[in-house]
UniProtKB/Swiss-Prot annotation:
NCBIfam families: PRK12904.1 (NF009538), secA (TIGR00963). This is Protein translocase subunit SecA. It catalyses: ATP + H2O + cellular proteinSide 1 = ADP + phosphate + cellular proteinSide 2. May bind 1 zinc ion per subunit. Part of the Sec protein translocase complex. Interacts with the SecYEG preprotein conducting channel. Has a central role in coupling the hydrolysis of ATP to the transfer of proteins into and across the cell membrane, serving both as a receptor for the preprotein-SecB complex and as an ATP-driven molecular motor driving the stepwise translocation of polypeptide chains across the membrane. It comes from Rhizobium rhizogenes (strain K84 / ATCC BAA-868) (Agrobacterium radiobacter). One of its GO terms (biological process) is protein targeting. The lineage of its organism: Bacteria, Pseudomonadati, Pseudomonadota, Alphaproteobacteria, Hyphomicrobiales. Keywords: ATP-binding, Cell inner membrane, Cell membrane, Cytoplasm, Membrane, Metal-binding, Nucleotide-binding, Protein transport, Translocase, Translocation, Transport, Zinc.
Length: 906
C-alpha cells in the first residue's frame, strides 16, 4: 500500500529533488561555457584566476562568479587530471558551496567534486581547509589535486603529523590546505598556548570542506581533542591494584555492556577493602571515604581494563605497547592513549611498561572547533541517517546527489543463525562458492579478533588464497583494498576497509603502476608498460563483471547503520554490478545486548535446526530498530556533551581572545594598572569593610596582604590610628604608593623590556590558571549529575557554578600578576617563556575514554642533504616519502629505507 506521503512525493517530488533541481540552471550555464573554455590556451585559462580575483575586489560576490569559476575548474581538471566532472558532480560542488552536506555514493568522485567549491572559495584569498580522516588521504589528495590548483595559479599546502611550526605556518598560508581533523584541532589549541603572535600557525577559519563528514562530525563528536602534559609516575600503584582483580568472582562486580560501565557489588567492595587494608593502601574504614577517592578511581580503571576492554578488539599489544584500535575504522592509533589512568590500567593488565599519566592543558570538541568556521560543508556516502543531527548542531542540510549511473547492487536480506560457529560455517561456504565462479569477495568483520578467527577457519578448510586486512597490517591497506576487485580475490577486512581507497573491479591502475613500475624511469618504455597494465585491468574487470561484480559479505551488524551502509557501498560503484549480504548470529554483540533471548526462544519454537538460518524482512526491521535505538542514545550523548562543552567553550573563547589581545598589545601599562587597582579595592574592602568601626578594621591582615601582593612594608597601623581617617583615605594612600613603585620599576626596566615582562607574566599566569580551571570544571561535571536527585537541573547548576569558578579565575589572575610584577627584577637575559611538554589526545568515540598521543611541538628536524651521512640513517632527519633515499640507492625513500618504517615482521 502506497502512503499519502509517497503519493505526494511522486506528484511534487521530495524536498531533496527540488533542491537538486534548483541547481540545474547553473549546470546549463556552466555547460554553455564549455566550448569557450576549451578554446583557451593554458596560459589564458590560468589567467582567469587573476581575473576572478579582480572581480571580487571590485565588489562581486562568490555567487556572482560561480558559473565561470566552475567552468574554468572543470576545464583545468580535464587538462591536468584527465577527468571532466559530470553534471551531477557540478551539482555536488554547488551543494558544498552553499554550506550543506553532499551525500554521494562510493565511486562517484567526491574528491573531484571538492575541487570546484575549493577553487571558487580560495579566490577570496582567506584560505580553504580540506579536511580528511587520515594523513595518507591528506597527502594523496593534496599531491593529486595540487597539480590542478597549481595550474590555476594557486598554492596548495598539507598538514600532517611531524611538521615543524614553520612548515605548518607556510601550509596554512597557502590558498588551499589539506589536513586531518586532529591536526587542525591540535594546531588551534597549540596556537592558543603560544607566547608570541608570530609563533602562531593558523590564520583563521574561513571555509572548511570535511571529507567523510559523518565520521568526523558525528562519530568523533562526543569526544574532545585534548592537549596534556605528564604527571608524576605511579606505575607501582597500578601494578599493585591490577593484582587484586583476578581474585574477584562474578558476584563481586556488575558489568553493563550497553553503557560500558563496571561497578563493584557490596561483596566485592568488602573483599577489596580487606585486600587494600592488607596492602596498606586503605585510609580510614571505608573504601568510599573521601581520602580514598584516588584509590577507588584506580580500582575502577583496573576492573574496566579486565572486564570491558578486550585485547585484539579494543586494543592490541605491539612492540611492548598497548595500541588502541578505532572501533569505527578498525585502524590502529599508535601514540593515542586513554586518559584518566585507563591506559595505565591496561598496561598493568598486559604487563608492559607503564607510561606516566597526563594532565589536561587545553581541550576542545570537534563540534565547537568546526562551528568556528564562517562556512562549513561536507561530503560522505552515508549522511542521511544523521540528517537531524547535522541540522540541529551544525546547521547543515544533507542533500543526496543523484548517481551518474543507476546503482545495480543487489542488497539481500540478512541470514540469522543461532551461534557463531553456524554463522562462520555458512560464510565460508558462501565465500568458496563465490570464489569458484571467479567473483571477488570482500568480507567485513567488526574486530581484528573476528577477522583472524575467520582467516584461521578458512585455513583449516584448506583455503589460503585470501588477504587479511586489519589494524595489524595497516601499512598494506591501500594496496590490498585497491586489488580487492580482481576476479576471484577474497579479502577479509575490518571496518577500516570502508573508507579512503576505491575498490575498482579488475584492480586499481594507479596502485599497479606504483607497485610494478616504481623503478622504471618516465619515457616510452614506461608509457607502453602502463598501457599494457591498463589493458590487462580491463580484461580482469570484464571477468569480475561477468561473475556478478564485488560481493560484500558482512559477518556482523555494527551498532551504527552508517557503518553497515559504508561496507555495502564498497560494491556497485559507478553502475557496476554487485551484491551484499549480512550473516548474523544470536551471539553477535548487537543481538546479544539488545534482547536476543526472546528471539532465540522464538526460533526454537519455529523448529530451527543446527546449521539452518532464518531469512525474513522482519529480522532486518527488528535489527534496524535496535540500531536506531543505539544511534538515538549516541545522539543524546553528543547533544548533552555539547550543552556542557558550550559552557566551557564560551569561557575558552574569552580566554583565547584575551591571549591574542595581550600578544598584539604594544603597551600593557593600562591593563596591569587596572589589575593593580582591582587588587587594592579587594584588599581594602576585605580588611576595612564599609561602615565598620575603626576598632573592627583588620590592620594586621591588610599589612600582611600588602606585603604579599605589592612587596611593600607600609605603616598601616599608624595610618589607622590617625584621627578621622576613612577607608577611602587608606585606599588612596595604598594606590599612590603602589603606582609610584610600579612607575619606578618601569623607568628602571625601560618601556620595551617592561612590556615584554608584563606580557610574559600575564600570559604564563593566565595559562596556569586556565589549566587548573579545566581540571576544576572536569571535577564539577563528574559530580553535577547528582544534583538531579535533589530535583535541580544539573545543566543549570553547572552553568552557575562554572561562572563562579570563572570569576574566581579572573580574580586569581589579577592577584597573581600583581604579586609577580611587584617582585620581578631585571636579569641579564630574560628567558623566553616555553610552553609545557605536550601530548595530544582524542577520546575514543565508542568508550568515552581518552586516547593520548605524544605530539611534540616540533617532532623531527629537516636536515639539508649535504649534512646527511649515507651510511648513518640517524643523521638524515625527516625525509619526504617521495624524495630520493639518502643511502644513494637511487630509489624513492618510500621504496627503500622508508619501506621499513612502522612495519613489523608477520
Amino acid at each position: 500500500m502506497v502512503s499519502l506521503g509517497g503519493i505526494a512525493r511522486k506528484l511534487f517530488g521530495s524536498s531533496n529533488d527540488r533542491r537538486v533541481k534548483s541547481y540545474q540552471p547553473n549546470v546549463v550555464a556552466i555547460n554553455a561555457l564549455e566550448e569557450q573554455m576549451r578554446a583557451l590556451s593554458d596560459e589564458a585559462l590560468a589567467a582567469k584566476t587573476v581575473e576572478f580575483r579582480q572581480q571580487l575586489a571590485d565588489g562581486k560576490t562568490l555567487d556572482d562568479i560561480l558559473v565561470p569559476a566552475f567552468a574554468v575548474a572543470r576545464e583545468a581538471s580535464r587538462r591536468v587530471l584527465g577527468m571532466r566532472p559530470f553534471d551531477v558532480q557540478l551539482i555536488g560542488g554547488m551543494i558544498l558551496h552553499s554550506n550543506a552536506i553532499a551525500e554521494m555514493k562510493t565511486g562517484e568522485g567526491k574528491t573531484l567534486v571538492g575541487t570546484l567549491p575549493v577553487y571558487l572559495n580560495a579566490l577570496a584569498g582567506k584560505g580553504v581547509h580540506v579536511v580528511t580522516v587520515n594523513d595518507y588521504l591528506a597527502q594523496r589528495d593534496s599531491a593529486t589535486m595540487g597539480r590542478l590548483y597549481g595550474f590555476l595559479g594557486m598554492r596548495t599546502g598539507v598538514i600532517v603529523h611531524g611538521l615543524s611550526d614553520d612548515e605548518r605556518r607556510d601550509a596554512y598560508a597557502c590558498d588551499i590546505t589539506y589536513a586531518t581533523n586532529n591536526e587542525l584541532g591540535f594546531d588551534y589549541l597549540r596556537d592558543n598556548m603560544k607566547y608570541d603572535r608570530g609563533q602562531m600557525v593558523q590564520r583563521g577559519h574561513n571555509f572548511a570542506i570535511v571529507d567523510e563528514v559523518d565520521s568526523i562530525l558525528v562519530d568523533e563528536a562526543r569526544t574532545p581533542l585534548i592537549i596534556s602534559g605528564p604527571l608524576d609516575d605511579r606505575s607501582d600503584l597500578y601494578i599493585t591494584i591490577d593484582a587484586f582483580i583476578p581474585g574477584l568472582t562474578k558476584d563481586d562486580y556488575e558489568i553493563d555492556e550497553k553503557q560500558r560501565s563496571a561497578n563493584f557489588s557490596e561483596d566485592g567492595t568488602e573483599k577489596l577493602e580487606t585486600m587494600l587494608r592488607e596492602a596498606g593502601l586503605l585510609k580510614g574504614e571505608s573504601l568510599y571515604d573521601v581520602e580514598n577517592v584516588a584509590i577507588v578511581h584506580h580500582i575502577n580503571n583496573a576492573l574496566k581494563a579486565h572486564k570491558l576492554f578486550q585485547r585484539d578488539k579494543d586494543y592490541i599489544v605491539r612492540n611492548d605497547e598497548v595500541v588502541i584500535i578505532d572501533e569505527f575504522t578498525g585502524r590502529m592509533m599508535p601514540g593515542r592513549r586513554y586518559s584518566d589512568g585507563q591506559h595505565q590500567a591496561l598496561e598493568a593488565k598486559e604487563r608492559v611498561q607503564i607510561q606516566p599519566e597526563n594532565q589536561t592543558l587545553a581541550q576542545i570538541t570537534f563540534q565547537n572547533y568546526f562551528r568556528m568556521y564562517d562556512k562549513l560543508a561536507g561530503m560522505t556516502g552515508t549522511a542521511s541517517t544523521e540528517a537531524e543531527e547535522f541540522g540541529n548542531i551544525y546547521g547543515l542540510d544533507v542533500i543526496e546527489v543523484p548517481t551518474n549511473l543507476p546503482i545495480q547492487r543487489i542488497d539481500e536480506d540478512d541470514e540469522v543463525y543461532r551461534t557463531h560457529e553456524e554463522k562462520f560455517k555458512a560464510i565460508i561456504a558462501e565465500i568458496l562458492e563465490a570464489h569458484k565462479r571467479d567473483q571477488p569477495v570482500l568480507v567485513g568483520t567488526t574486530s581484528i579478533e573476528k577477522s583472524e578467527l575467520l582467516a584461521e577457519l578458512m585455513r583449516k578448510q584448506g583455503f589460503t588464497n585470501f588477504q587479511v586486512l586489519n589494524a595489524r597490517y595497516h601499512e598494506q591497506e591501500a594496496y590490498i583494498v585497491a586489488q580487492a576487485g580482481v576476479p576471484g580475490a577474497v579479502t577479509i577486512a575490518t571496518n577500516m576497509a570502508g573508507r579512503g581507497t576505491d575498490i575498482q573491479l579488475g584492480g586499481n591502475l594507479e596502485m599497479r603502476v606504483e607497485r610494478d613500475l616504481h623503478e622504471v624511469e618516465p619515457g616510452p618504455e614506461r608509457d607502453a608498460a602502463i598501457a599494457r597494465i591498463a589493458e590487462e585491468i580491463q580484461v580482469l574487470k570484464q571477468r569480475s563483471i561477468a561473475a556478478g561484480g564485488l560481493y560484500v559479505i558482512a559477518s556482523e551488524r555494527h551498532e551504527s547503520r552508517r557503518i553497515d551502509n559504508q561496507l555495502r557501498g564498497r560494491s556497485g560503484r559507478q553502475g557496476d554490478p554487485g551484491r551484499s549480504k549480512f550473516y548474523l548470529s544470536l551471539q553477535d554483540d548487537l543481538m546479544r545486548i539488545f534482547g536476543s533471548d526472546r528471539m532465540d526462544g522464538m526460533l526454537q519454537k519455529l523448529g530451527l535446526k543446527e546449521g539452518e538460518a532464518i531469512v525474513h524482512p522482519w529480522i532486518n526491521k527488528a535489527l534496524e530498530r535496535a540500531q536506531k535505538k543505539v544511534e538515538a542514545r549516541n545522539f543524546d550523548i553528543r547533544k548533552n556533551v555539547l550543552k556542557y562543552d558550550d559552557v566551557l567553550n564560551d569561557q575558552r573563547k574569552v580566554i583565547f581572545e584575551q591571549r591574542v589581545e595581550l600578544m598584539d598589545a604594544t603597551d600593557l601599562t593600562e591593563t596591569v594598572g587596572d589589575m593593580r587597582h582591582d587588587v587594592i579595592e579587594d584588599l581594602v574592602s576585605k580588611h576595612i569593610p564599609e561602615r565598620a568601626y575603626a576598632e573592627q578594621w583588620d590592620a594586621d591582615g591588610l599589612k600582611t596582604a600588602v606585603a604579599n601582593f605589592f612587596d611593600l612594608d607600609l605603616p598601616i597601623h599608624d595610618w589607622v590610628k590617625e584621627e578621622g581617617i576613612a577607608e577611602d583615605d587608606i585606599r588612596a594612600r595604598l594606590t599612590e604608593v603602589a603606582e609610584k613603585a610600579a612607575a619606578e620599576k618601569a623607568e628602571r626596566f625601560g618601556p620595551e623590556i617592561m612590556t615584554y615582562v608584563e606580557r610574559s607574566i600575564v600570559l604564563q599566569t593566565l595559562d596556569n590558571l586556565w589549566r587548573e580551571h579545566i581540571v576544576n570544571l572536569d571535577h564539577l561535571r563528574s559530580v553535577i549529575g547528582f544534583r538531579g536527585y535533589a530535583q535541580r537541573d544539573p545543566l543549570q547548576e553547572y552553568k552557575a557554578e562554572a561562572f563562579e569558578l570563572f570569576q574566581a579565575l579572573l580574580n586569581n589572575l589579577r592577584q597573581a600578576v600583581t604579586a609577580q610584577l611587584s617582585r620581578v627584577e631585571l636579569v641579564q637575559q630574560p628567558a623566553e617563556p616555553q610552553p609545557p611538554a605536550m601530548h595530544g589526545s582524542h577520546i575514543d568515540a565508542t568508550t568515552g575514554q581518552d586516547e593520548f598521543a605524544p605530539l611534540a611541538m616540533i617532532n623531527e628536524t629537516v636536515v639539508s642533504p649535504e649534512n646527511r651521512d649515507p651510511q648513518n640513517p640517524t643523521t638524515w632527519g625527516r625525509i619526504g616519502r617521495n624524495e630520493a633515499c639518502p643511502c644513494g640507492s637511487g630509489k624513492k625513500y618510500k621504496h627503500c629505507h622508508g619501506a621499513f618504517e612502522n612495519n613489523e615482521v608477520v
